[in-house]
């Protein structure tokens, strides 16, 4: 069993090909790691969210960590960790473009006929919740793998 490093091409491929990653954020003594749907364009990671702990923490401390992996079995996996800055996207046209790209990327993998909202989420009470679109501007990334 030996842990090895992914090269730059392998890191880029894993980031581009996965659908779900995990964001790690920290503020006010709280560390929070949560899975998110995302797209990666070679420079930035783009995500969407409703208001909540993750957004609150990232607004207070924009330094975040992002992790994505592909696990085939216990000794056959690869993982990338990226560090970067949370930036909220506020321009309506850019928000719409990013949301459309997220929908185009995720919809082929959704089993039922539901369509993700384009301007907001609907909560359990049926109220519309503001949709927050953001990016992580990557400053550093590393990758590891194990294959037996």
Question: Can you describe what each PLM-predicted range is?
Answer:
Residues 54-61, 65-83, 87:
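Helix-adjacent hinge/juxtasegments
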Residues 1-17:
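Extreme N-terminal tail/first-helix region
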Residues 27, 70, 137-140:
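Short, structured patches in soluble enzyme cores that scaffold and shape functional sites
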Residues 18-50, 66-67:
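Short beta-strand segments
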